[in-house]
Amino acid sequence: MTLLVRDGRPCLLEAHLARLSQSAKMLDLPAPDLDAWRAAVALGVRRWADDHDGEGVLRLVYSRGRESGGPPTGFATIGALPDRVAGARRDGLAAITLDRGLPLGASDMPWLAAGAKTLSYAVNMAALRHAERQGAGDVIFVSSDGHLLEGPRSTVVIATAGPEGDPLLLTPPPWYPILRGTTQQALFEVARNKGYDCDFRALTPTDLFTAQGVWLVSSITLAARVHTLDGQRLPDAPLAADIAGLVDTALTSGR
């Protein structure tokens, strides 16, 4: 799990702990001791805040433990934001679509661990390196049957016009073989309270090119607007400032 630390506090901690528990269940790990995790987070954040004024990246790692047997192992680390984050927040980024090699039905194949937060980042990192070679900063995965899934480290959110012409925020359904984003969930909750319509919908790459804005939403980069997709410039996003503000509000909603 990766959390943002801002103003000396972890953002959306309880949502991340809930996802830690769910991922542990999917991987047949013992249920994590959430109070112990809260104590570890509090200690790490306090020590970070003693020496740093800026934001930090907090990672929670939970494993089965030693190969020889014994109890599970858990630890937390905290460090500075990657250099790429400030630029992606400020300027947006270029992305490419890539076939993930999974059908939508992969969520019914538990041995693939689709939808679990794991340390198996080989495919995600390889995809990001491939994007970099193509001159892009991120990736949007597509299922083998042509539907949008997620980014290697983010959730896809688009803005479009609803039935009455009002803004409508959409994201792929959580029953797809994806990791449901904590930041996306918090964003939708805040957006609904502000009067926005939000929903899940089956989306295809074509929807990205006709949308009124495309964002890759995550705990650290927050809302990175996709301004170029597969080498094609996307239309301007009228809601760019609004979405950025909603995500900022969402970050503190679960404290």
Features from the language model and the residues they span:
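Helix-start/capping segments and mature chain N-termini
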Residues: 1-35, 39-43, 63, 67-255
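Phosphate/pyrophosphate-binding loops at sites that engage ATP/ADP/AMP, CoA/4′-phosphopantetheine
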Residues: 45-51
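Ordered, amphipathic secondary-structure segments that act as subunit-interaction surfaces
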Residues: 51-61
